[in-house]
Amino acid sequence: MIARTLKALTTGALPDELDVVVVCNGCKDGTATIARGFGAPIRVIETALGNKTHALNLGDKVARAFPRIYVDADVVVTLSTIRALAERLERGGVLAVAPRPYFDLTGCSWPVRAFYDIRCRLPSFGEGIGGSGVYALSEIARRRFNDFPNLVADDTYVRVQFKHEERETLTCVKSVVFAPHTINDLIAIEARADFGTFELARVHPELWTNKGDGNYKALMCLFKHPSLWLRLFIYCYVRALARRKAKMRLRHNDFIWERDLTSRGAAGAPNSSSPSSL
């Protein structure tokens, strides 16, 4: 998995163009060795603590450059996309940018495909920060908060630091997000996201005005099209179960970091924690 990410990220880079920090958090496989095998501009940090926000903070402490781009290890983003994000921030006018997510549905069951068909029609699909696995911050933007707090929804925490006019999703570039293959894995991943959202709203209610538009009105409009009804039923079914699961865990303070191994292939060994790269 990390080889796929780093190859796409670094292919064609000019000397000294990138400073890439890979933080292997709780990894028990060969992730660190694979990352080091790429050589410059990759730097690798290892920590025994399998905690994403801890990894983000470690990476931030050693990262040298701005704009600073945060990339989940299980998505694919090309060098041209990285350049586009950096160039947009350098032009000014916004503080945070992200690419638009492209969901790779290879190997996914029909219900999963139906779910993402509906998702891509909703306003939240246009929010790259928190959906694409990639976001870029200017130096001024990074000063908006201190360390990443120990929250599940770290990317949403970043997004709500900025008003709508301070952030932008670039529709001309994309990140490839690998969707879970089965509906059970999809529900688990959605429940994790919902848990993070509920937790963030509880801990930082003062930031919630920056969350962005909801999906309810757009979702209701889709019901005007009978050809979408079956897909809408699946979407609503997944969302209802995920929200219920997340609320129960929040009530009992019982969070489990749900990981989708179906979209990771051999790289997603059950005992390995995914690294975060910056």
Residue ranges and their predicted role:
Residues L6, E17-G26, I45:
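Short beta-strand/loop segment that forms part of the nucleotide-sugar
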Residues R68:
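Short aromatic/hydrophobic "clamp" motif used to bind/position activated sugar donors
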Residues T33, E46-A63:
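Glycine-rich, basic loop-to-helix element that forms the pyrophosphate-binding segment
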Residues A8, C24-A32, L49:
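A conserved acidic beta->alpha catalytic loop
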Residues L79-W110:
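Conserved donor NDP-sugar-binding/catalytic core segment of glycosyltransferases
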Residues M1-T11:
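Short, well-formed alpha-helical segments that are part of the catalytic scaffolds
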